[in-house]
């Protein structure tokens, strides 16, 4: 009998509670078990169960554990479960004592029992008890924010996540209302509010940010649209999942910052930060390191068979593999699996019909565990969120396909000697033909990417490029290939294939990567193979230059020369919220005639910085109206540009006080660089500006414009759709997103790329002052776009 009791204590009691509650249990048992400080810190659940068996002869401490759980509001349901298990172990049918137990329990109010039990049949007595509970818990519940009382992830449960000792979190956090093993369908459908005991913490807590999600939009029961994000933070002894309902704090939760949080709500191990909360960065003397064991717990995902044993109502966080996806009218069923079982995830609202496919990883935030007919299901609620990590393409793991690009890169094209110009190898310093794979892909310092990733990258570059055929071998020198300059050896492939951490690897990054591979270069393919080594693959542009944005931004904001480098190297989806003012935007244009893909360029600014933006969602054109203040999130930083895709969030902002952009900053954003400055800049950067056409020459599929000012001349090479523009000598070209490419004599030339845009400004040839080379050098803000 005692063995049965110990099984219940360990497997159905201690095993399912979270770290926070386990530490609480150890503290409450410290006198009985003679636990000193070191033992309370180090003893695990098995050791505590052993001590309880030794101390409490007869029931292995089960009765004591039930009493402790009953005194913890969010564990009351678990206490009832243990009482039933104890009766079973005694050989008594639970049904016999059910009424008696309910009556005995009714006096004790429980904030976590306000919702109808998830069990199947609740007796009238049980229902009455719940009603009483609800009334008594009212005052305390009033402390909780309006949003908290909504069905979305009760905060209390939030901390009990599947991630990082999450199993337990679920129990405590989820304790909200659901207790039984099965769930009433109506309860799930309505997703009733689950009032739980929350405590307003005035005193500050110092934590380190471990990870954050991107901001996302959710809908309140009042049909109001709001934005929030999730975060994980930790002290030196425990971690917390955080719901941040104030997105203006996103910057505070970036990186691995040490921050101080005050006036937050706490339920168990979950923190909620809202408009009333205060968040500030910690001082130098408040820095600390989080132990690896805490970090690992925070990242931990519970096995599905463990989830099936968890109490209904728990909140779950974790990363799971998608086995099957079924889309209904208002819900989506995601069947997840691991090596221990399967489970359904029901997504509604923002979690409905997320773009994903079998084999992808779903990172779930704040999902409620529900039970019906002994079957467990994860249900999305108001604050739930799903982040997608795309599966790896199997073909990239094939040894043959991985070797192919390297072998090809070492075989020069037979026609190379006879068709290339002397300038065709001017970019070899950036990509030496003798060591194509090392100089092309390796990082100059930290070697964080393995050979396999290099081969995969080469395979992708080879397969995804869509350059037409034989064009380059016969008509142009190597430098007319636009994208080679963008890949110096110092720009590792890490920015292309990897992201800063697992939580930044998502569908957005994969979508961005594939989009770039398909669109970023449009010069015919054979050109590259016929004039130079394999490093000249068309997609080189995806590897940002060593100082990509510095050279790009110096064309219009010299003081940012050292800042953009980090931005352009990241080459990944950015989840931070950036508030900017729109300075100007081009008209929408078709950049991919075959598929009729459209985009437009824009310039935006904060009060300190200016950013060039590529917008691939023309539905946002109205948002990018000059002088509008907008917030952008989930954008992509690449090569000195912010790239806005369909998954990017763009919203109007009523700035108070109104954002004021310094006039000097606006002027710097609209300055056209002098040609002698361009000649000395790093090749591979991108240039915007207004230039006068001195000569025009059409050769085959290319159009060459010679532009000039009072400091020199330069050639602009145009290919594809832009060759059809109506432009004559003496006109002015307003160039947007032209690549500065190398040329013999180290003068360089500007080349059109797939996202380039030209606007022709017609001039009167009889007015020489308009033809003055200097007249296009300084432009007004309105004139630039």
From Swiss-Prot:
A motif (Nuclear localization signal) lies at residues 96-100, 128-131, 134-136, 140-143. Its main location: nucleus. It comes from the Eukaryota. It comes from Pongo abelii. There is a cross-link at residues 116, 128, 683 (Glycyl lysine isopeptide (Lys-Gly) (interchain with G-Cter in SUMO2)). Belongs to the HIN-200 family. Residues 88-99 have a biased composition (Basic residues). Residues 571-766 are annotated as: Interaction with TP53 core domain. InterPro entries: DAPIN, DEATH-like_dom_sf, HIN-200, HIN200/IF120x, NA-bd_OB-fold. The lineage of its organism: Eukaryota, Metazoa, Chordata, Craniata, Vertebrata. Lysine acetylation in the multipartite nuclear localization signal (NLS) regulates the subcellular location. Residues 192-393 are annotated as: Interaction with TP53 C-terminus. This is Gamma-interferon-inducible protein 16. The HIN-20 domains mediates dsDNA binding via electrostatic interactions. The keyword Translocase does not apply. It is found in: Nucleus; Cytoplasm.
């Amino acid at each position: 009998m005692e063995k049965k009791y110990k099984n219940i204590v360990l497997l159905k009691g201690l095993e399912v509670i979270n770290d926070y509650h386990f530490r609480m249990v150890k503290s409450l048992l410290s006198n009985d078990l003679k636990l000193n400080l070191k033992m309370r810190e180090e003893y695990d659940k098995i050791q505590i169960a052993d001590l309880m068996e030794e101390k409490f002869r007869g029931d292995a401490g089960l009765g004591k554990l039930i009493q402790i759980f009953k005194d913890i509001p969010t564990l009351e349901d678990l206490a009832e479960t243990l009482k039933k298990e104890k009766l079973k172990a005694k050989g008594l049918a639970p049904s016999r004592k059910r009424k008696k137990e309910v009556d005995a329990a009714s006096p004790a109010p429980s904030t976590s029992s306000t919702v109808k039990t998830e069990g199947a049949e609740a007796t009238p007595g049980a229902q009455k008890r719940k009603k009483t509970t609800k009334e008594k818990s009212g005052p305390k519940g009033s402390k909780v924010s309006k949003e908290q009382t909504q069905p979305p992830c009760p905060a209390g449960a939030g901390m009990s996540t599947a991630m990082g000792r999450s199993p337990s979190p679920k129990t405590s956090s989820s304790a909200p209302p659901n207790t039984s093993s099965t769930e009433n369908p109506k309860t799930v459908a309505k997703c009733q509010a689950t009032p739980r005991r929350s405590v307003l913490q005035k005193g500050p807590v110092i934590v380190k940010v471990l990870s954050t999600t991107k901001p996302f939009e959710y809908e309140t029961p009042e049909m109001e649209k709001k934005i929030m994000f999730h975060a994980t933070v930790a002290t030196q002894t425990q971690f917390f999942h955080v719901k941040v309902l104030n997105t203006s704090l996103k910057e505070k939760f970036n990186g691995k910052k040490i921050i101080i949080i005050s006036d937050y709500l706490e339920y168990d191990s979950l923190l909620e930060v809202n408009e009333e909360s205060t968040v500030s960065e910690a001082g130098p003397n408040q820095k600390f390191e989080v132990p690896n064991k805490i970090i690992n717990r925070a990242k931990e995902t519970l096995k599905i068979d463990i989830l099936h044993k968890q109490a209904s109502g728990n909140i779950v966080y974790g990363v799971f593999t998608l086995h099957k996806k079924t889309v209904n009218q208002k819900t989506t069923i995601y069947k997840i699996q691991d090596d221990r079982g399967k489970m359904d995830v029901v997504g509604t609202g923002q979690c409905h019909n997320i773009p994903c496919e079998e084999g992808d990883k779903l990172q779930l935030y704040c999902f409620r565990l529900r039970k019906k007919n002994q079957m467990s299901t994860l249900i999305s609620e108001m604050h739930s969120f799903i982040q997608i990590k795309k599966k790896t393409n199997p073909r990239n793991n094939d040894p043959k396909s991985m070797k192919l690009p390297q072998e090809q890169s070492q075989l020069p094209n037979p026609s190379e000697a006879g068709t290339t110009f002397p300038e065709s190898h001017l970019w070899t310093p950036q990509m030496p033909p003798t060591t194509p794979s090392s100089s092309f892909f390796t990082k100059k310092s930290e070697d964080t990417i393995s050979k396999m990733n290099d081969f995969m990258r080469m395979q992708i570059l080879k397969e995804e490029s869509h350059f037409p055929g034989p064009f380059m071998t016969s008509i142009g020198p190597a430098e007319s290939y636009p994208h080679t300059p963008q890949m110096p050896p110092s720009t590792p492939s890490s920015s292309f294939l990897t992201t800063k951490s697992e939580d930044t690897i998502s569908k957005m990054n994969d979508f961005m990567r594939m989009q770039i591979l398909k669109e970023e270069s449009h010069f015919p393919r054979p050109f590259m193979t016929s004039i130079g080594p394999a490093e000249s693959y068309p997609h080189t542009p995806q590897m940002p230059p060593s100082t990509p944005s510095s050279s790009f931004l110096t064309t219009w904001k010299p003081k940012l020369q050292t800042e953009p480098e980090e931005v352009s190297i990241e080459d990944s989806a950015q989840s931070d919220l950036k508030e900017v003012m729109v300075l100007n935007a081009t008209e929408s244009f078709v950049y991919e005639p075959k598929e009729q893909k459209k985009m437009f360029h824009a310039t935006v600014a904060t009060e300190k910085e200016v950013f060039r933006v590529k917008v691939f969602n023309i539905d946002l054109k109205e948002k990018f109206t000059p002088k509008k203040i907008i917030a952008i999130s989930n954008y992509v930083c690449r090569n000195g540009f912010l790239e806005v895709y369909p998954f990017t969030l763009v919203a109007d902002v009523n700035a108070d006080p109104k954002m004021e952009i310094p006039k000097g900053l606006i002027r710097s954003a609209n300055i056209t660089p002098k040609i002698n400055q361009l000649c000395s800049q790093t090749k591979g950067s991108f240039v915007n500006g207004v230039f006068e056409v001195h000569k025009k020459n059409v050769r085959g599929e290319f159009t060459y414009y010679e532009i000039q000012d009072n400091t020199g001349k330069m050639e602009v090479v145009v290919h594809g759709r832009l060759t059809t523009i109506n432009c004559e000598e003496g006109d002015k070209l307003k160039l947007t997103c032209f690549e500065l490419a190398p040329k013999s004599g180290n003068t360089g030339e500007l080349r059109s790329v797939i996202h380039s845009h030209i606007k022709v400004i017609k001039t009167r040839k009889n007015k020489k002052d308009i033809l003055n080379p200097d007249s296009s050098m300084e432009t007004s803000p309105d004139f630039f776009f």
